[in-house]
Amino acid sequence: MRPADTWKDYELLDATDGNRLERWGETLLIRPDPQVVWKTPKQSPLWAKADAIYHRSNQGGGEWEYRRRLPEKWKISCGEGEDKLTLIVSPTGFKHTGVFPEQAVNWAWYQQKIRAANRPVKVLNLFGYTGGATLACAAAGATVCHVDASKGIVAWGKDNAAASGLADKPIRWLVDDCAKFVAREKRRGN
């Protein structure tokens, strides 16, 4: 297993009893995580200082409890130099923040493979979400087709591209159902 250790602005501080304590820039968030099945004593005194806590609802979904006023969105950075990405964080109604920080190790791997190819590389990113993988590939020189079914999420991805200085890179942003998109492209011979 390779850790996602290229983050300057994100840190998993502690995890226990179904929850994660994370630092997103200067903001501390507590979010539920079903993979955190152990019940150990909380190791960090920062649990009590969290800026916001996401509470799941028994009916599905949930809501954020804000302990202090937070901006609607803020930026964090991952990587350095030509690999640096600036991503917009915004707590959503379904516990996510717009970034899956554990994916940074995959983004770095994509970049290494794209740069080592010594030829033009095209990437199809299905279910592209807010574009972390898309931007990593574009920063490494790939031409990217980013597909997600949510118009708002694709707009967020474009905002991330602008924040990262990658708005002019060859990225095709598509709002479409991924399965239908692939079926259409297959029929077209692409």
PLM segments and residue spans:
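Conserved SAM-binding motif I beta-strand of class I
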Residues: 143-148
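A generic structural signal for alpha->beta connector loops
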Residues: 120, 141, 168-170
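Conserved alpha-helix/loop element of class I SAM-dependent methyltransferases that forms part
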Residues: 101-118
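Non-catalytic substrate-recognition/targeting regions of SAM-dependent transferases
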Residues: 6-22, 29-101, 108
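S-adenosyl-L-methionine
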Residues: 150-190
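Conserved class I S-adenosyl-L-methionine
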Residues: 119-129
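N-terminal accessory targeting/assembly segments
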Residues: 1-4
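Conserved SAM-binding loop of SAM-dependent methyltransferases across substrates and taxa
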Residues: 130-142
